[in-house]
């Protein structure tokens, strides 16, 4: 890969020289920063096993190199990168993988290390969704995740990625992360705080990332990070795990934030060393047991990860003064829920006891049971998955429910050809040579559900959401 010119402020270089361990070469750091970042993906094991994914993609000639800290993660090299963007491949469109930077897979690996199996998890700064979807896969869509995003424009992207990956156990909120300690004290088994930061580690992806860098800005950001980690720590139950991470390299936003928390609650904070997280983790290990990943160590983005345990309760914060408002949903009664479940099963949609039916007017939703304890404490932007809308003739099943709940071995499943699948993703009706018998057709490609169609004569009426419709060149190579 070609070199590219990264902008470095002099004060930043001075700071890095001081921060870099003696075991690392500063010249190697500069050289690594000038190299473009390696592309990487994470297989979505909610949809496909790693072995099956490797078999499916073997004919493409992709070079997939395993990422040591994530069994589902791979660095990827493709000969036809310019001919077809990775995001336009059939496997990406159907949610079989997520394009995710390798080092950003580290925090979730740390969160679930040593057999940790949390049932209620919060991702404090979740967009665009790489870590939320990784957490959901580790939880196998069980339990519940509260995924929060402060930026309103990024909440839509977060939901789109969660939906594409077939995730059903997530509730979305749109708050400043500093509210949660007071709003939901001691409610979570595990919390990921991938904190907003100065982004010093992303120069391989964005050579101008440091154009507005200054030591003063770092100090302001670190002050916000201290408030965020304090809030997250209050929301964590005693015995729970907190992972703090950034994509920056200075110690003020990293080690110092974690040490501040320990100084503030000396009897409640225990640092959990990460030296055994994966083979070679000790190369990035700090004396506190954190991972301070300079880009030359593993040829990835610069990153920082710390894991800690809350060993005992701490004094509560004052209760919030805001009102959440009335919750507009009501649980569906058992008898009606049974009828809905049977109607859904008839078209290939099934769910387990981790999800419960709720209703708002003509809308039917499935909420993760583990999130119900938070109802009335926070206001949700979106909760669970929308299953259907009711109408006179029955139910209008929703696309996100099909992606999350359908299995390809259903009797209504109908496998499309590559050309027909492209037509589907372009929002067009499909005219198969031999039309299926059923009226409600579970449309699949590569034996993966990609939507639900109505059969009208020999035509499959497209229900792919308009906001997801693709144009341009897709996986068959036709524009």
UniProtKB/Swiss-Prot annotation:
GO terms for cellular component: cytoplasm. InterPro entries: Methyltr_RsmF_N, MeTrfase_RsmB-F_NOP2_cat, MeTrfase_RsmB-F_NOP2_dom, Nol1_Nop2_Fmu_2, Nop2p, RCMT, rRNA_ssu_MeTfrase_F, RsmB/NOL1/NOP2-like_CS. One of its GO terms (biological process) is rRNA base methylation. Its EC number is 2.1.1.178. Disulfide bonds: none annotated. It catalyses: cytidine(1407) in 16S rRNA + S-adenosyl-L-methionine = 5-methylcytidine(1407) in 16S rRNA + S-adenosyl-L-homocysteine + H(+). The keyword GTP-binding does not apply. The keyword Nucleotide-binding does not apply. Keywords: Cytoplasm, Methyltransferase, RNA-binding, rRNA processing, S-adenosyl-L-methionine, Transferase. It is found in: Cytoplasm. Signal peptide: none annotated. One of its GO terms (molecular function) is rRNA (cytosine-C5-)-methyltransferase activity. The active site is at 247 (nucleophile). It holds the Pfam family YebU_pre-PUA_dom. S-adenosyl-L-methionine binds at residues 125-131, 149, 176, 194. Belongs to the class I-like SAM-binding methyltransferase superfamily. RsmB/NOP family. Specifically methylates the cytosine at position 1407 (m5C1407) of 16S rRNA. HAMAP family: 16SrRNA_methyltr_F (MF_01579). This is Ribosomal RNA small subunit methyltransferase F. It comes from Shigella boydii serotype 18 (strain CDC 3083-94 / BS512).
């Amino acid at each position: 890969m070609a070199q590219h010119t990264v902008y470095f402020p002099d004060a930043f270089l001075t700071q890095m020289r001081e921060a870099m361990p003696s075991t690392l070469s500063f010249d190697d750091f500069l050289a690594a920063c000038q190299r473009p970042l390696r592309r990487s993906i994470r297989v979505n094991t909610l949809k496909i096993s790693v072995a099956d994914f490797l078999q499916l993609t073997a004919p493409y000639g992709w070079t997939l190199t395993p990422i040591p800290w994530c069994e589902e993660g791979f660095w990827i090299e493709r000969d036809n990168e310019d001919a077809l963007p990775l995001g336009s491949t059939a496997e990406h469109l159907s949610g079989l993988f997520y394009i995710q930077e390798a080092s950003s897979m580290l925090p979730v690996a740390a969160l679930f290390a040593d057999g940790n199996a949390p049932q209620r998890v919060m991702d404090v700064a979740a967009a665009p969704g790489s870590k939320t979807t990784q957490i959901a896969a580790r939880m196998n869509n069980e339990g519940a995740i509260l995924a929060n995003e402060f930026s309103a424009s990024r909440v839509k992207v977060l939901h789109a990625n969660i939906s594409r990956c077939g995730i059903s156990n997530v509730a979305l909120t749109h708050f400043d992360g500093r509210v949660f300690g007071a709003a939901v004290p001691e409610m979570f088994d595990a919390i990921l705080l991938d904190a907003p930061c100065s982004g010093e580690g992303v120069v391989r992806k964005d050579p101008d990332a440091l154009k507005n860098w200054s030591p003063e800005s770092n100090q302001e950001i670190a002050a916000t990070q201290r408030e965020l980690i304090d809030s997250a720590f209050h929301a964590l139950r005693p015995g729970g795990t907190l992972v703090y991470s950034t994509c920056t390299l200075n110690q003020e936003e990293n080690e110092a934030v974690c040490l501040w928390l320990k100084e503030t609650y000396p009897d409640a904070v225990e640092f959990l060393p990460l030296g055994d997280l994966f083979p070679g983790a000790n190369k990035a290990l700090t004396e506190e047991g954190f991972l301070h990943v300079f880009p030359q160590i593993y040829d990835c983005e610069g990153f920082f990860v710390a894991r800690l345990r809350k060993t005992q309760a701490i004094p509560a914060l004052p209760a919030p003064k805001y009102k959440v408002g009335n919750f507009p949903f009501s649980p569906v009664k058992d008898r009606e829920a049974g009828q809905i479940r049977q109607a859904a099963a008839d078209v290939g949609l099934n769910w387990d006891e981790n999800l419960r039916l709720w209703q708002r007017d003509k809308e039917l939703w499935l909420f993760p049971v583990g999130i119900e304890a938070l109802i009335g404490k926070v206001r949700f932007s979106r909760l669970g998955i929308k299953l259907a809308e009711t109408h006179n003739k029955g139910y209008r099943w929703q696309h996100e429910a099909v992606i999350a709940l359908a299995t390809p071995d259903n009797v209504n499943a109908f496998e499309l050809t590559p050309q027909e699948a492209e037509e589907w993703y372009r929002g067009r009706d499909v005219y198969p040579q031999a039309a299926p018998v059923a009226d409600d057709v579970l449309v699949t490609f590569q034996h993966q559900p990609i939507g639900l169609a109505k059969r009208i004569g020999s035509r499959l009426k497209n229900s792919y959401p308009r906001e997801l419709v693709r144009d341009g060149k897709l996986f068959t190579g036709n524009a």
